Amino acid sequence: MCCEKWSRVAEMFLFIEEREDCKILCLCSRAFVEDRKLYNLGLKGYYIRDSGNNSGDQATEEEEGGYSCGTAESHDSKGIGLDESELDSEAELMRSMGLPLQFGRITAHKDFEVSMNTRNKVKIKKKKHQKKYLDEIVQESWRKEYEEDDILASDDPSSIEQYENTRTYELQSKKDTETENPPVENTLSPKLEITEKWEKYWNEYGGGLLWQSWQEKHPGQALSSEPWNFPDTKEEWEQHYSQLYWYYLEQFQYWEAQGWTFDASQSCDTDTYTSKTEADDKNDEKCMKVDLVSFPSSPIMVDNDSSGTSDKDHSEILDGISNIKLNSEEVTQSQLDSCTSHDGHQQLSEVSSKRECPASGQSEPRNGGTNEESNSSGNTNTDPPAEDSQKSSGANTSKDRPHASGTDGDESEEDPPEHKPSKLKRSHELDIDENPASDFDDSGSLLGFKYGSGQKYGGIPNFSHRQVRYLEKNVKLKSKYLDMRRQIKMKNKHIFFTKESEKPFFKKSKILSKVEKFLTWVNKPMDEEASQESSSHDNVHDASTSSDSEEQDMSVKKGDDLLETNNPEPEKCQSVSSAGELETENYERDSLLATVPDEQDCVTQEVPDSRQAETEAEVKKKKNKKKNKKVNGLPPEIAAVPELAKYWAQRYRLFSRFDDGIKLDREGWFSVTPEKIAEHIAGRVSQSFKCDVVVDAFCGVGGNTIQFALTGMRVIAIDIDPVKIALARNNAEVYGIADKIEFICGDFLLLASFLKADVVFLSPPWGGPDYATAETFDIRTMMSPDGFEIFRLSKKITNNIVYFLPRNADIDQVASLAGPGGQVEIEQNFLNNKLKTITAYFGDLIRRPASET
């Protein structure tokens, strides 16, 4: 019998002033129940009880074509339902007259939630696809690198040349395959294209990124210029290379999917300005080097300081791979010469050399060259990537060279300013003025609680602060669609105006066009007849001749208000035309008198007959629809009190067996607990521990008492009003559990010291419906008797107390009932996604997390 949907939302610690060590733990939970079917039955005015648990479902499905049931079933626990929990007399009157109570679709939130779920599923599917695609790229890259490692491990230049030729042949064969097989292009071409772009990107920026990260990991240390060759750092370097490689590959894939593109910088081709080196380098401080590294674990460096016997091999390798590195001055001069000879009108343009890398947020240095593979550097400097000018592949060698160094070339222009990398805000990032931690505030505003400044229980001073830890994800989003009786912030609606000052174009309805044509056809004989009648009746109807179209409208479409209100223009035009006909066509009256009556009779006979047939069909349909429907009017005692009308519509949600003889007094209509909420509370008490006796200190007409008895517990029902005791006994007999309840007419404040029970249920009077108008409900001053006093007396009976309170009760006062260092669970009771009440549980009734039990 417990609620189907119950969740633990948050834990809130309340710290007492001057006693920070004695904090009170407040467990916050939410319970959701629904009774839309019972409410719909109350609106229909009858109730049929069957043997099943879903009472009244069959009757609801049979009547109204299953409308009410369909409406109820279309709302789940997360949807936004009609404002059906509380209907005033005016709304009830509007509903009975068939007028709408609201505008817009009821299922707006459900449609929004379905669309959000679909969007989330698509995002998850895309992420899985990207991850799978990335894994395939990783596997292929590893396989290729291992193959390159096996070939480059040997010093034989012929094997390297053979490998380069094989690689070129493979790429060419792949391109040919893509050209020959267009259908396979969708699966192969994106992968090949992304791989090539990534290789270009990594060859251009990878070295700088590796070396910069290596320096950040080892600050203040004397770094080796070749950590990949140093035995102590070789293994660490390989791990460092692998981590950064796959990290930036993933980032590259992500940013490329977001629409970013990578274009290698334009510069002269390497082969154009590759110059022959001479053996008599006099002042070469930085020697020519060759980068043959494709895998970090096997770097191969060729230095021109080696013996003369290996110079020939070096030259062959340089010609085969074209990975040449000169010192900065020679490269600059070679660039200027080759670019001038290659293209007469092409000149080196000075551009900013600091470009932002989308994937890494890094930028290439400005000191005369681009970043390089850090494992291909041979300098003894601690920052070799920043000072060398080499490239890691022949295809990209000497690309992206922004401008020449200051020694050669045109120095008339100043260097471009160094641009700082711009930080692009992602779509899910918050603005600077937004608070990123708004979901985790210390006030617990997302819970919908009310905090007041009333007196605390047990002499506790005010609470210094609160700490809230949310236990449920997306609390803000879920709370947004719950009606917690607070002001809802609506989004601003923007009205967009066109730049051109033109009149707005309204699309004309097809039905309206047909009606205009019909009226034009009908008004031709009617205007002539009206003119005849106006001349033969002593000008009595002269003033009304301009309204012939209106008279015809009433004869043709009697009762059709839509066309009369929305189409005034045709009437005006027709009146003007009819007046013109009276002045200009008087001489044709005699000739038309013979034809007008025949046409008019045809129209006036056919149209009313069709309208009469439609009216009769509608009346017959309504009679069949209302056939066998039993409508109960308001009882005299309810009709005499207009403010009880809306509670009468909710009678089945108060007692599902209302028609079996349930009786209520005026105060009982206001104070009785809805049956579904009472059923949830009783079920929770019965499931907490073995409970035999429950005291209902303020039983009223027996709403909670009956539900406690239905769970099998014995109940002591107490109330000071003998009328309510009689009503509660009658209602218990209707449910057949009067033998499990002991009714006592007396004052709980006087009887508390003589009672013994396992659980005490407190639901004192809240002062009528006016309790909801208060911003915060003070449980000490706004209840009679005093809320603190009845709790103190209940503690003498047992520590297991259930306190049933209004939804706007002061949470600080409720928490203070637990005492310093104590615990309390405050449960919000939602009825059809609307916050109705809160229930405070003390003692063993608290549902603690599984880790604490």
UniProtKB/Swiss-Prot annotation:
Changing W766A: Loss of catalytic activity. One of its GO terms (cellular component) is nucleoplasm. Residues 608-619 have a biased composition (Basic and acidic residues). Its EC number is 2.1.1.-. Residues 431-442 have a biased composition (Acidic residues). The modification Phosphothreonine is found at T60. Residues 631-846 are annotated as: Sufficient for catalytic activity. Ubiquitously expressed. High expression in heart, skeletal muscle, kidney, liver and placenta. Residues 156-171, 564-578 have a biased composition (Polar residues). The modification Phosphotyrosine is found at Y146. Its main location: cytoplasm. Residues 53-80, 149-187, 334-461, 527-632 are annotated as: Disordered. Keywords: Cytoplasm, Methyltransferase, Nucleus, Phosphoprotein, S-adenosyl-L-methionine, Transcription, Transcription regulation, Transferase. GO terms for biological process: 7-methylguanosine cap hypermethylation; ribonucleoprotein complex biogenesis; spliceosomal snRNP assembly. The modification Phosphoserine is found at S55, S85, S89, S96, S141, S154, S189, S412, S438, S578. It is found in: Cytoplasm; Nucleus, Cajal body; Nucleus, Nucleolus. S-adenosyl-L-methionine binds at D719. Residues 367-382 have a biased composition (Low complexity). PANTHER family: S-ADENOSYLMETHIONINE-DEPENDENT METHYLTRANSFERASE RELATED, TRIMETHYLGUANOSINE SYNTHASE. May form homooligomers. Interacts with CREBBP/CBP, EED/WAIT1, EP300/P300, NCOA6/PRIP, PPARBP/PBP and SMN. Belongs to the methyltransferase superfamily. Trimethylguanosine synthase family. This is Trimethylguanosine synthase.
